[in-house]
Design a protein with these regions (language model features):
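Basic, amphipathic N-terminal segments that precede the first structured/catalytic domain
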Residues: 27-157, 365-367, 378-380
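Short alpha-helical "recognition helix" segments of helix-turn-helix
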Residues: 19-22
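Conserved beta-sheet core of the metallophosphoesterase superfamily
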Residues: 208, 235-264, 272-377
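Short, amphipathic alpha-helical "recognition" segments used to contact nucleic acids or chromatin
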Residues: 1-15
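Core catalytic region of metal-dependent phosphoesterases/phosphodiesterases
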Residues: 102-119, 133-247
């Protein structure tokens, strides 16, 4: 390639005359003159230019253009990520320090049982005629109060020193599940993230004030999905999971709390000899819907060895209704838990199904490895 053509190409790529002069070992005045002469000769040279040369030049220019666009997009994305991280950090700091919860009085009696709180499908920020973020908080904390009173009733017979909190997913309403969802929420994704995380913190702290030790097992749901189903976003990159992680870190100083991350889409609950699975419910069936018979058959296949971990029961959310179905072995059950939400128009009109808001409370015999008492806790 001649010097004039090279100088013209560098100029086209955005290099200044001084940069070109430095690269070619020339004076700037010589570069200007050389580029001008080359431009004048360009029409004549183009007559002898082959189609392949023109195609190569077009591809080169297109590549340069795309590279510039990618650089700008990357810069914008990095700015957005940094803004999100900064906003989250500032929102967390605004919550203030969270002091450790004083432990309850020890109960040294024998035959202790454990409580299990199945809290699922809060749909944080969902708006219906009877539900919004404020109602969500009221109902969740009402469950905590009722669970405390029921625990006291159980303690009249035996100690209840340990609690497992099973967060079942769809804790946030999200924004990516159906067209028009943006018009059925009262909070942005950012506000959902902060509000639900703080409510999870408050629930765990309430449990720590009642029980000597608390373990959280957390499962994420389909409403926490980021983007559409067609987007190449890993399933575990989920807003529910993000709320759990923030709450977990805010409670990192609680020595009586055990809370691990949840990268898998099915979680395990273990209390002494009691073993159960925690799933959201959209894992079974097509498009997140399955009949009760299909759900139970799925659990039976898992129990027979398809799932590589022996368990007795399965806890399911997702359907916003409270149910219990026996498994084939006559021992285990599939426990389906309701939602804090009420008056869901889609469920009532399209599915002809609706339910009063409720959550689930169990008591577990860790030696016998089974549920000893089951409560449907009404929240309305």
């Amino acid at each position: 390639m001649k010097k004039g053509e090279l100088a013209l190409r560098l100029r086209t790529d955005g290099k200044s005359n001084s940069e070109i002069a430095s690269l070619l070992g020339m004076k700037q005045s010589s570069v200007r003159r050389l580029i001008a002469e080359t431009r004048q000769a360009a029409p004549e040279a183009a007559i002898h230019e082959s189609p392949d040369d023109r195609r190569t030049e077009d591809l080169r220019r297109a590549l340069v253009h795309v590279q510039r666009q990618l650089a700008k997009a990357k810069e914008r994305t990095e700015d957005l990520v940094e803004a999100t991280i900064s906003s989250t950090r500032e929102a967390t700091l605004a919550l203030g320090p969270i002091p450790p919860v004083p432990p309850p009085a020890k109960d040294t009696r024998k035959r202790a049982e454990a409580a299990l709180w199945h809290l699922t499908d809060w749909q944080g920020a969902k708006v219906t005629t009877s539900y919004n973020s404020e109602v969500m908080r009221e109902r969740v904390m009402r469950f905590c109060e009722k669970a405390s009173r029921i625990t006291d009733i159980q303690r009249a017979d035996h100690p209840v020193n340990h609690c497992v909190i099973a967060f079942g997913g769809d804790m946030v309403e999200g924004l990516f599940n159906f067209p028009g969802q943006a018009f059925e929420i009262d909070s942005t994704i950012f506000a959902q993230f902060v509000n639900v995380s703080r409510l999870e913190v408050d629930v765990v702290r309430y449990a720590l004030s009642i029980y000597e030790t608390v373990e959280v097992v957390a499962e994420w749901g389909n409403h926490g999905r980021i983007g559409s189903k067609r987007d190449t976003v890993p399933r575990s990159d989920n807003i529910d999971r993000m709320t759990y992680e923030l709450a977990r870190q805010l409670l990192a100083d609680e020595k009586r709390l055990k809370w691990n991350d949840c990268p898998e889409d099915v979680q395990r609950i273990e209390v002494g000899n009691y073993r159960a699975l925690l799933m959201h419910g959209d894992e079974v069936g097509r498009n997140g819907f399955a009949s009760p018979n299909t759900i139970v058959q799925h659990a039976n296949r898992w129990r027979s060895g398809a799932y590589p971990w022996e368990f007795r029961d399965v806890y399911v959310g997702h359907y916003h209704t409270h149910n219990e179905w026996s498994m084939a072995n006559g021992e285990g059950s599939v426990y389906q838990t309701g939602s804090c939400e009420s008056d869901n128009r889609y469920a009532g009109v399209m599915l002809a199904a609706s339910a009063k808001p409720s959550q689930r409370l169990h008591f577990i015999d860790p030696d016998a490895g089974r549920v000893t008492a089951s409560y449907k806790v009404w929240l309305d």
